Regions:
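Surface-exposed, low-hydrophobicity beta-strand/loop segments enriched in small/polar/acidic residues
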Residues: 1-85
Length: 85
């Protein structure tokens, strides 16, 4: 179980049509507010723009991965995600 301390939080929107990353370049953790785990393709904090996305499963609730970008996927229509750091 993850219990991070989050001071800033927001909604991850439009993931079906465009990649998500914070405009200020901050890295973040992902909260899955859906009812089931979801597989996302992400770039982790230490990865560069040239690196390929990696696929990983995000459980319901806050997840420990520190992410810099999430890849868009048209199948994520019923996924509810939040970012926080």
């Amino acid at each position: 179980m993850v219990s991070p301390q989050i001071a800033n939080m927001g909604t991850i929107a439009d993931l079906t049509t465009k990649n998500f990353k914070l405009s200020d370049g901050n890295v973040f953790q992902v909260k899955n507010d859906s009812f089931a785990p979801v597989t996302l393709e992400v770039k982790l904090a230490s990865m560069s723009d040239e690196d390929d996305f990696v696929s990983t499963s995000f459980a319901v609730g806050w997840n420990p991965e520190i992410v810099r970008e999430i890849k868009a996927n048209a199948s994520h229509t019923n996924v509810s995600l939040k970012w926080g750091y």
